[in-house]
Amino acid sequence: MVLAGLAFAAPTTWAARNILVFGDSLSAGYGIPQEAAWPSLLAKRLEQKRLDYSVTNASISGETTSGGRTRLAAALDKAQPAVVVIALGANDGLRGLPIKTMRDNLAAMAEAAQKKNARVLIVGQRLPPNYGPYATQFHEAFAAVAKEKKTALVDFLLDGVATRPELFQADNLHPTAEAQPMLLDTVWQGLAPLLK
């Protein structure tokens, strides 16, 4: 009886630490096979590098920071992550939602993850220049929250992709499968130091 209990407990002891990817359609792999989305490629990279981490992708297409803030507690309880990648905000910007609300939501999510002893990476976004001053304030909000909450920061998820129309699906919003390795490389720059 005791041996059976020990055998059952062992996998929990050796389980990989978890990375929770908490984003919108840009991380959910909208319009492409799931295995091609950057969080799936992240899982493969971790395996190749023999890093003891698993990946839980809790991204939902269309999600705003308000929606993310509402569902983060349950996602944290379920995933028990060592690292949380917050990749939300693009839909707030595209809808022209108040920047203060987005900042407050990002800060609350970072704080909630930190209270669960998770390291946090905030992934920034940019808007097209035709959004005017709002676009500048929007982009600056990500860095401001990262500084305030002392999290890691990736400046722009679509860095190197946004200016290349051939790397977008027909809607001109969502990256193709071919763009996903570039998204992963961008995220990796901020994520890798958190895995040590």
Residue ranges and their predicted role:
Residues 4, 9-11:
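N-terminal signal peptide c-region/cleavage motif recognized by signal peptidases
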Residues 12-61, 71-80:
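Serine-esterase "nucleophile elbow" of acetyl-processing enzymes
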Residues 28, 64, 129:
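Flexible, glycine-rich phosphate/dinucleotide-binding loops
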Residues 31, 56-65, 93-97, 172:
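Acidic/histidine-rich helix-loop elements
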Residues 7, 19-21, 60, 105, ...:
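Residues at the start of alpha-helices and the adjacent loop-to-helix junctions
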Residues 69-196:
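Alpha-helical cap/lid subdomain in secreted, periplasmic
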